[in-house]
Amino acid sequence: MSASGEALTTRDYIGGHLNNLQLDLRTFELVNPHAENTPSFWVLNIDSLFFSVLMGLLFLWIFRKVAVKATSGVPGKFQTAVEMVIGFVDSSVRDMYHGKSKVIAPLALTVFVWVLLMNALDLLPIDFIPYIGEHILGLPALRIVPTADVSITLSMAIGVFILILFYSIKMKGVKGFTKELTLQPFNHPVFIPINLILEGVSLLSKPVSLGLRLFGNMYAGELIFILIAGLLPWWSQWLLSLPWAIFHILIITLQAFIFMVLTIVYLSMASEEH
C-alpha cells in the first residue's frame, strides 16, 4: 500500500521502486541505480537476500516459540493458528505424496510458511521501508519483497530441482533414472536422442516454471501497488489500494500454496518407482 508524498516524476517514482540494493561482487561496492552502469551478472541483490533470510528466521522463531510453550490443555489462539497450518500442510502431503519419506512434510511446511511470509511483505506501505532505507540508512535503493525478485524464486526452485534429482536417483538408481530419460516415451534405442531431448526439456521446465510462476505473480502485484501510488493523487489512492490489498491477501496465500503443492507433486513423481 502507499504512503507516497515525494516530489518525483511518475517515471522516476516507479523506476525507483523497481531497483534492488545491489552489491557489485567485482568491487564489493554498492551499485548506484541512478548512475549509468553497464549491466553485469556479478551483482548480488542484498536486499532480497536480507529480507528472505529475515522471514526465514521469523518462521523459525514463531514455530519454536509455539513448540516451547505448547500445552496439552486448551491451546491459546496463537498455538491454535499454528496447529491449523501444520494440520493443513500435513493433510496436503498425505493426499499428494505417496512415498515414505519423513522429510517431505517438514519441507512442505517450511516452503509454505516461508513463501507466505515473504509474499506478505508486499502488504506493507510501498514507500515506508524504501523511505527508511534512503533517508535514514542512506541506501541508494531498497526493495522488500524477495519473491518479486526472480533470482530468489529461481534459487528456491533450483533447490527443489536438486531434491527432485536426489529422490529420482535414490528411488530408481542411476541406471533406472538414465533409462527414464532415454527410453521414454519411445522404448527403442533408435529414439534415445529424441527421448533425451523430450525428457530433458520436461525435467528442466519444472524448476523454471516453478520459479517464474511465483515471481510473475508477485512482481505484477507489487507493480500494481507502485502504479496506484505513482499515478494517483495521494488523497484518492486508498480507493484502489485498499481493495487491491484485500484481494492481494488471497493472491499471496494462493501463490504460497501453489509453490508448496508443486513441490510436493514433483517430489512425489520423482519418488515413484518404475
From Swiss-Prot:
Gene3D superfamilies linked: ATP synthase, F0 complex, subunit A
Species annotation: Proteus mirabilis (strain HI4320)
Lineage: superkingdom: Bacteria
Gene name per UniProt: atpB
Location within or outside the cell: Cell inner membrane
Membrane-crossing segments per the record: 43-63, 103-123, 149-169, 223-243, 245-265
Protein name listed in UniProt: ATP synthase subunit a
GO biological process, one term: proton motive force-driven plasma membrane ATP synthesis
Subunit structure: F-type ATPases have 2 components, CF(1) - the catalytic core - and CF(0) - the membrane proton channel. CF(1) has five subunits: alpha(3), beta(3), gamma(1), delta(1), epsilon(1). CF(0) has three main subunits: a(1), b(2) and c(9-12). The alpha and beta chains form an alternating ring which encloses part of the gamma chain. CF(1) is attached to CF(0) by a central stalk formed by the gamma and epsilon chains, while a peripheral stalk is formed by the delta and b chains.
